[in-house]
């Protein structure tokens, strides 16, 4: 956290421990190193976030019924399968869930404004789902999961919870290279998909979304 400007400088008043440094020029190099080690680009994940941020940020809500709601339920169920697999450190299962998620997103057929809103979201689900399916290590699947979590959050904000069970918005401050990251899960207890068994309970539950209800707040 930065304090008031002092000439050409901004003092850091919180969020930085003694001896730690702030990266101001090497972000691209750090991001490239992450990709080389099997993770998804943090910058491309941020770009994905713009896909539906406008609609969700404006508080847009679209109610779906019947087959349309069932199709989005299949998308969220596949995402949740990946969430559980990564929390359990089960890479192969995460790959399978990624393939299932990609196919579920492709199968969604909406009309009118719902279709226009869903189109950029579907592109992210399909691309990142395939990225997880084709990942060479669990780190790659977790990188894809970061972008998928952003989009799943937006899905809950725009279309509501299409499932017959509650889902939760969870947050870990140490995920995403200590920048923090959210994800969606069904369990009431934190199951950290970014770290698995190493830090399974690291994080907090921020919100619960009941069936048919919408996640409140801005998209990103």
Stretch-by-stretch model annotation:
Residues 1-220:
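Intrinsically disordered, low-complexity terminal tails/loops enriched in metal-binding residues
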